[in-house]
Amino acid sequence: MTRIAIVGVAGRMGRTLVNAVQQDPEASLGGGIVEPGSSLVGADLGELAGVGRLGVNATDDPAAIADAFDVLIDFTAPRVTLANLAFCAEHGKAIVIGTTGLSDDELAELDGYRERVPMVFAPNMSVGVNLTLKLLETAARALGDEGYDIEVSEAHHRHKVDAPSGTALKMGEVVAKALSRDLKEDGVFERVGQCGPRGDKEIGFATVRAGDIVGEHTVMFATEGERIEITHKASSRMTFAKGAVRAARWVASRGNGRYDMQDVLGLKG
């Protein structure tokens, strides 16, 4: 049984994670963490999540529940995540990170913990999205540089704060790597006004923020006479939550290192 604690337990994703842990027979809820000074300190996590009283209360101090969990799940903000990563290194805990929007410096800081913490870091925990990444790699290798224009589009709810989504960027990185390209050089994130014709090696990105869209991603390979589109659509946050719990169970028995969902699902190699 893997004991799991959830950071940001009062948020939309946090409440969904509580539900996912309760549904998993191989996991148990060890605790939930809210913002320092939150009025929700002491609240029952089951009541917060709408699943009934569980007898596990929210805290704003991870150290207070350090003996109650094995793995921390964090879908919050970059600086919060890095602070929790340091906590896990100090207390011998594993961590699953679904936070997106990290800067290059923050990613480097995160990577510096790979020898100190067992961590799964992935922009998207959905099994379907991670299978989609494998499909994209296969498609890009097969098509090669045969005149296919590549465009990545994504849509999310109006509350999402980073753009493009971490999943869209990961899709672009997978395609770029398969084509021996560098996304930092070939990625195009804005086209405005007289921007000129499309470059041959461009990987374009388009973003939509509207309503309550959970998450939709499409990668288009377009050439003269045909267009291939590979799409993933999420209709519920539960798909991400279940993937995160699966990752937590997996990483609980792993040594220090930085892993991703491809490792969890056995899709590498």
Curated annotation (Swiss-Prot):
EC number(s) recorded for this UniProt protein: 1.17.1.8
Spans through the membrane: none
Catalytic activity: (S)-2,3,4,5-tetrahydrodipicolinate + NAD(+) + H2O = (2S,4S)-4-hydroxy-2,3,4,5-tetrahydrodipicolinate + NADH + H(+); (S)-2,3,4,5-tetrahydrodipicolinate + NADP(+) + H2O = (2S,4S)-4-hydroxy-2,3,4,5-tetrahydrodipicolinate + NADPH + H(+)
Domain of life: Bacteria
Keywords linked to the UniProt accession: Amino-acid biosynthesis, Cytoplasm, Diaminopimelate biosynthesis, Lysine biosynthesis, NAD, NADP, Oxidoreductase
Family: Belongs to the DapB family.
Residues annotated to bind NAD(+): 8-13, 98-100, 122-125
Pathway this chain belongs to: Amino-acid biosynthesis; L-lysine biosynthesis via DAP pathway; (S)-tetrahydrodipicolinate from L-aspartate: step 4/4
Chief site of localization: cytoplasm
Name under which the protein is recorded: 4-hydroxy-tetrahydrodipicolinate reductase
Organism field: Chromohalobacter salexigens (strain ATCC BAA-138 / DSM 3043 / CIP 106854 / NCIMB 13768 / 1H11)
Gene3D superfamilies membership: Dihydrodipicolinate Reductase, domain 2, NAD(P)-binding Rossmann-like Domain
Enzyme class: oxidoreductase
CDD domains: DHDPR_N (cd02274)
GO molecular function list: 4-hydroxy-tetrahydrodipicolinate reductase; NAD binding; NADP binding; oxidoreductase activity, acting on CH or CH2 groups, NAD or NADP as acceptor
Binding site for (S)-2,3,4,5-tetrahydrodipicolinate: 157, 166-167
Entry's Gene Ontology BP terms: diaminopimelate biosynthetic process; lysine biosynthetic process via diaminopimelate
Function text: Catalyzes the conversion of 4-hydroxy-tetrahydrodipicolinate (HTPA) to tetrahydrodipicolinate.
Active site as annotated: 156, 160
GO cellular component: cytosol
